[in-house]
């Protein structure tokens, strides 16, 4: 099994939309963001689809919201990895934080791994809805079936009510103010145009977001190259890339870390001392010139 997939493998260049389509098509879900798969439940079911019967799906919690609930799903996944002798390390602490880059990378690996097993062909005999034993969607379906059954039994016990064939009285026409129709039509057109403009704006923003996201992803892939992993500049870039909070001091910390690694702080201090000495010499020379005059 292709468990060792290098960072420069084509698998890590698969886009976010393709990953989401892969998940939604196979598991009959409706995910719109990569972060929604941070609980680990989706990954467990993908493994269950690829290796039927290996994953204890009754232990997988699709409603996990807290980190401790998500960690339980990753424990199930780790047990499956052990059974299948998969050597891929699970960075649970990063994945449960819901960071898009970390979760996208893991899902890219998972897709590449599953495709290497089944050739990218969907298992037509697999019913993902039935296999999910704890999902909220399945609960709602069960509830609706119970309601329909109760309605059927009630209809069996109660005879149908006879309907009258008498013609109904004339309905009173709703009165509209003069010009009301034209005003409402103009409002509808204005609102429709506003909606279209907003859709265009959202589309442009999504494209811009995806563009910068792909750039960040390229930088991350480059930084994770083993030959570059320990370089001071790469360590500084990772510090900024993996910062969880929008903290302005992150850049300063990264610069300080880089300066320490390169030994630039000593040079800066020496430069300051030299400048101070030069200033003192200039002041002494100026004072000596004044005394001579």
Curated annotation (Swiss-Prot):
Keywords: Cell cycle, Cell division, Cytoplasm, Cytoskeleton, Microtubule, Mitosis
Tissues expressing the protein: Highly expressed in guard cells of leaf stomata, pollen grains and pollen tubes. Expressed in young roots.
Ranges of compositional bias, category Basic and acidic residues: 129-141
Subcellular compartments: Cytoplasm, Cytoskeleton, Spindle pole; Cytoplasm, Cytoskeleton, Phragmoplast
InterPro entries, per database record: CH_dom, CH_dom_sf, EB1_C, EB1_C_sf, MAPRE
MF GO annotations: microtubule binding
General remark: Plant microtubules behave differently from those of other eukaryotes in mitosis: they lack centrosomes and spindles are barrel-shaped with unfocused poles and no astral microtubules.
Oligomeric form and interacting partners: Homodimer and heterodimer with EB1A.
Domain notes: Composed of two functionally independent domains. The N-terminal domain forms a hydrophobic cleft involved in microtubule binding and the C-terminal is involved in protein binding. In Arabidopsis thaliana, EB1A and EB1B possess an acidic C-terminal tail that has autoinhibitory function, but EB1C has a tail region with patches of basic amino acid residues required for nuclear targeting.
Role according to the record: Binds to the plus end of microtubules and regulates the dynamics of the microtubule cytoskeleton. May be involved in anchoring microtubules to their nucleation sites and/or functioning as a reservoir for distribution to the growing end. In plants, microtubule minus ends are not necessarily severed from the nucleation site and transported to the plus end of a microtubule as part of the recycling process. May play a role in endomembrane organization during polarized growth of plant cells.
Protein name as annotated: Microtubule-associated protein RP/EB family member 1B
Organism encoding this protein: Arabidopsis thaliana
Lineage: Eukaryota, Viridiplantae, Streptophyta, Embryophyta, Tracheophyta
Encoding gene per record: EB1B
